[in-house]
Amino acid sequence: MAQEKFSFRKETKLKIKFLILFIFSFNIQSSNLVLDFNNLIVNNFEFTQKTETNSSTTESKGKIFRMENEIKIEITEPSKELYRIIENKIEIYDYDFNQTSIYQIDDNNGHVLDFIINGVKKAVVKDLTNSSFSIKNGDNDILIELNEDNGFSLTYIDNMQFKNIINFQVIK
């Protein structure tokens, strides 16, 4: 009987050690993937965005350039636009209509911009796999998938309930 109690305690301690090791390794995996993403996001990118509406799919193309105090997003197709992100505002230049607008970035409109500017905080990561994770975006999630050739993709549902897939590739 004493032998059984000793064996049970030893087995329980072993299970606890395995559980701790599993949780620790999951946390390391999470940290590495998020760290890889945050290291990747500081580059300049070319991107293609596909938006699936109820009846069609539209495609936009452009580039993202990071400078010391601003981020420039140039849309080259299907129309020409420039977005300048400086501190907590975004300046929009629509070259086709010769219009300029300035908006404040806040919690209601800045989820995707926030992690493109600042990276992802490990605390908001969920649904982690070897090459992807999700983060909360208002009522929806944003799926981030890293690919092996210095790029990543974002998949999310926007505020109009349209599915968006954006593929980013580092400019070399």
Predicted regions and their residues:
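Bacterial N-terminal signal peptides that target proteins for export
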Residues: 7-18
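Sec-dependent N-terminal signal peptides
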Residues: 17-26
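N-terminal leader/targeting segments and the immediate start of mature chains
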Residues: 26-61, 68-69, 170-172
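Short, solvent-exposed coil/turn segments at beta-strand boundaries
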Residues: 39-42, 65-71, 85-89, 128-130, ...
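Short, surface-exposed charged micro-motifs
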Residues: 61-63, 80-82, 141-145
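An acidic-aromatic
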Residues: 64-112, 159-164
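Flexible, surface-exposed loop/linker segments and immediately adjacent secondary-structure boundaries
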Residues: 98-135
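Gly/Pro-enriched, hydrophobic low-complexity segments
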Residues: 127-172
